[in-house]
Regions:
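Disulfide-rich extracellular domains of secreted proteins
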Residues: 1-146
Length: 146
């Protein structure tokens, strides 16, 4: 049976904010079951490896190494124009930027396009097997202007 680990709390927020500029509990802008491009989070206008980390809701071990998929949407403001690179990571046991836990998998997007793009990466069997605690998973996003 499919499981979905959606954001449940902000763990680290370095210069990230909601689409309206507020900075309290921004995870609730990205926790929907169906993507809503009218509410989102954003990095600083000129990001310098600014990190955002959210804890995912509790999942149970599916007892298989297949069909572990991380899905998200990303884009940039056309007005900003500069090259922005984005790294999306799945981590286990993240505590802080000084103690990032175990990197399970990641994907780098170079020169993010304007507008919204669906992002996804599927864990390999070895990456899925590296997860030992499905209740302690995080998504870490970093944005960097080149």
């Amino acid at each position: 049976m499919p499981q979905f680990g959606r954001p449940t709390t902000d763990t680290t927020r370095e210069a990230w904010e909601e689409d309206d500029g507020t900075t309290v509990d921004i995870w609730d802008q990205i926790d929907e079951a169906v993507a809503d491009d009218l509410d989102f989070i954003r990095s600083a206008q000129v990001p310098t490896t600014d990190a955002y980390v959210t804890k995912l809701g509790t999942l149970t071990d599916p007892l298989q190494s297949t069909s572990h998929v991380v899905r998200y949407r990303y884009g940039k403001d056309t007005a900003a124009g500069a090259q922005i690179n984005l790294v999306v990571e799945l981590r286990q046991a993240y505590v802080s930027e000084a103690s990032q836990g175990t990197l399970i998998a990641s994907l780098t997007h170079t020169d993010v396009a304007s507008g919204w793009t669906a992002g996804t990466f599927t864990l390999s069997g070895a990456e899925a097997d590296a997860i030992t605690d499905y209740t302690n998973l995080y998504v870490r996003i970093t944005a960097n202007q080149i």
